[in-house]
Amino acid sequence: MAGGGSRMKKSCACCKRYLEHLGGKMSCFLIRMTTDSMHSMIIPDRFVNHFGGKIPGTIKLESPNGILYVVEVTECMNKTVLQCGWEAFVDAHHIKVGDSLLFRHIENSCFEVMILDSDGSENVSLKSNRNGVSDESQESEDSEGPAGPPYILSWKSKSRLSSLQKKIIKEKVRSIQSEVPIYVAIMNKSNIGLTSSPCQLELGARYAAAVHLPDRRQAVVLQRGAAMGHRDADQERQMHHQAVPDQWLEQDS
């Protein structure tokens, strides 16, 4: 308990110095991450009142590396909550329970977010990459034999793939003979609706750029691999997609 209290004091002291640096010109609020806030986050009422008790339907969060994320704001039990897009922001920055997030209102519906580790230190490693594509790794076929199309592997999946799984993926990619890059991800609970959050799958910035996904919300058709080459209504499913600047979120309809 003593160690936890010490870390909290360091975190608060760091935030206090930052707020003093702002000279009271900007509105800020501090959130300490809990298990619940990893999936959705409640904005403090006092901060919401700064906006006349109402925050627009979407806001932009500027991460430490300068990338903007669009997050949906909803009302739940008289509370203002960040939901769709929030979990993707948390995952992209490897935010953990016990970390502290300092939100600074920049302009309109845009907020700068400072991420502090559980010991109260700013996570400076997040500032090193400003191109927004390190969350994914692009793999290609082995140098032996004819080169095949590349596939883009979710950063969450890369560390969990065995050598056999990687071999199977390469063989599958080669057999598909796609003219565009293929996206590969390991399914988890949030992808198949086993959590309290909406079912969704994040498609990263590199894949979105590689296949020219539009920067707007729209419906698309997903077709199972067995149905490739012909259209089968029973094997097609329409999904609603919400595009955000550096990620694509696939959300169950």
UniProtKB/Swiss-Prot annotation:
Keyword Transcription included in the entry's annotation: yes
Q: Which GO terms describe its molecular function?
A: DNA binding
Is the keyword Lipoprotein in the record?
no
Principal subcellular localization: nucleus
One Gene Ontology cellular component term attached to this UniProt record is:
nucleus
Alphabetical keyword list: DNA-binding, Nucleus, Transcription, Transcription regulation
Q: What is this protein called?
A: Putative B3 domain-containing protein Os03g0619850
